[in-house]
Amino acid sequence: MIMNYNVIDKIDVFDIIRHIKDPEFPKTLEELKVVNEDWITVIDNNDINDSDDINNNNNENYKGYCFIKILFQPTVPHCHLAPTIALCIREKIKEYLPKRSKIEIYIKKGTHQTEDEINKQINDKERIIAALENPEIFQLVKKCIKEDDY
């Protein structure tokens, strides 16, 4: 379900991901305090003025792009489903946003025992594709991001 956004902001992104169900607990990521609006950064090309410079490149290179950075906090420091939660967040955003987006997802600093290793994994395109090719992981992600009536 692609939404029609003129300019995307962190409130829009939070509204998209807040109702994702946790893969282990019968609650949403918002209810478990895994995601928070304040942990989201969005730079939408429609919101860039002439003095802004993303990644020290010319803004024209980014016409039509939206940059989204999301931090999340697993429920426990040894959460084995942190990569799955990141996949759910990424797939939910991709399902809703109409424009090309660069999405970066990270575990909030100091909240997981292997956060550096997992952060590399959850932002590696090849690993993301490989994970979603696994039928069990794919079905779990689809189940977690499925819309319910709220």
Curated annotation (Swiss-Prot):
Keywords: Chromosome partition
Xref: InterPro entries: FSCA_dom_sf, MIP18
Family matches, as Gene3D superfamilies: 6.10.250.1280, Fe-S cluster assembly (FSCA)
Record-annotated disulphide pairs: none
Gene Ontology biological-process entries: chromosome segregation; protein maturation
Highest taxon above the source species: Eukaryota
Family: Belongs to the MIP18 family.
Protein's job: May play a role in chromosome segregation through establishment of sister chromatid cohesion.
Protein name: MIP18 family protein FAM96A
Taxonomy of the source species: Eukaryota, Amoebozoa, Evosea, Eumycetozoa, Dictyostelia
